[in-house]
Amino acid sequence: MAKEIFRRDKPHLNIGTIGHVDHGKTTLTASITKVLAKKGLAVAKEFSSIDNAPEEKERGITINTSHVEYQTEIRHYAHVDCPGHADYVKNMVTGAAQMDGAILVVAATDGPMPQTREHILLARQVGVPNLVVFMNKVDQVDDKEILELVEIEIRELLSKYEYDGENIPIIQGSALGALNGEKKWEKQIETLMKTVDNYIKEPIRNIDKPFLMPIEDVFTITGRGTVATGRIETGTINTGDSIDIIGMGIDKLNSIVTGVEMFRKILDKGQAGDNVGLLLRGIEKKDIRRGMVISKPGYITPHKKFNAQIYILKKEEGGRHTPFHNKYKPQFYLRTTDVTGTIYLLNNLEMVMPGDNISVEVELLQPVAISEGLRFAIREGGRTVGAGQVIKIIE
């Protein structure tokens, strides 16, 4: 029976638990696995195994994250839970855990707290499209009016950060009660998961988006022409397709793909996630290089100025030991390219301390193919000092 869980015949979504420290995110994660395990849809995970999260590296940044997987009747979920607040900030800004939706956990005993607010803001900034709320620890609150007040506060906070505060479902329950097998609270976990199934929408899969591939390497095959290799980020490519080649300050080039190869075999097409070589008609090796991108015509354009949300590493994380000021000039690693840029601080901010998570304006030395939502690393002297995401393109 247990083997059944890994069949991939259901739509797959990435979700996570977010919210203030000690409001019960990890307990909720454990109780979801326990309740679903009773139906043969998950392997029950102990609180301690989720809380003791392994370290991962993403864009040179170490993050502690627990990945749990489970199913409902209609979907397969990968669920991310982080032990520490800083891990959430890093996880969301670096995109180590892309979330299609999240469960916001708020303890009824406290109501929304500073990190509740910060996680909602982060979710909004990094584009988590849908949230569902689990109001936890309601078994510790005797007064119905308090629960109503907490709900109003949560809804106001969600609306403030441009989520649909009026309509987002709020499920009341006790994660610990469910974990301890109390029927009443187990039922609320089932209600929560039905709500997640219905309210968190399926994302547009990468394969259904327009074609885009960052170039990693370029070489010539005698008698056949120039080949660009890379991993397809989105979409599909077929022999005979027209494409744009963009980036690094030059005018865009147009070409036609005359062959798609993978592991030295000719394919009829390549799709998101594949590492391929594309044979390009009429393109010289000297015309293109690593760091450019190949895309569906007109899909992506080069830009040099944008607003970004960035996280700056602490000294203990291998980052800078000192703050930086306005017009700081590090290297930006965008897809397969690195380019120098200037960071302009906003809102009269004078300096940025290691460990800060802030909004800034970036101006690159030369235009690069970027789009809103793109993640990047910030490096200086060969080491990663931060990570960020393009929030809005200016020019």
UniProtKB/Swiss-Prot annotation:
PROSITE patterns: G_TR_1 (PS00301), G_TR_2 (PS51722). The keyword Magnesium applies. Pfam families: GTP_EFTU, GTP_EFTU_D2, GTP_EFTU_D3. InterPro entries: EF-Tu_GTP-bd, EF-Tu_GTPase, EFTu-like_2, EFTU_2, G_TR_CS, P-loop_NTPase, Small_GTP-bd, T_Tr_GTP-bd_dom. Residues 174-176 are annotated as: G5. Residues 10-204 form the tr-type G domain. CDD domains: EF_Tu (cd01884), EFTU_II (cd03697), EFTU_III (cd03707). GO terms for cellular component: cytosol. It comes from the Bacteria. Mg(2+) binds at T26. GTP binds at residues 19-26, 81-85, 136-139. It is an enzyme of class 3 (hydrolase). It catalyses: GTP + H2O = GDP + phosphate + H(+). GTP hydrolase that promotes the GTP-dependent binding of aminoacyl-tRNA to the A-site of ribosomes during protein biosynthesis. Monomer. This is Elongation factor Tu. It comes from Karelsulcia muelleri (strain GWSS).
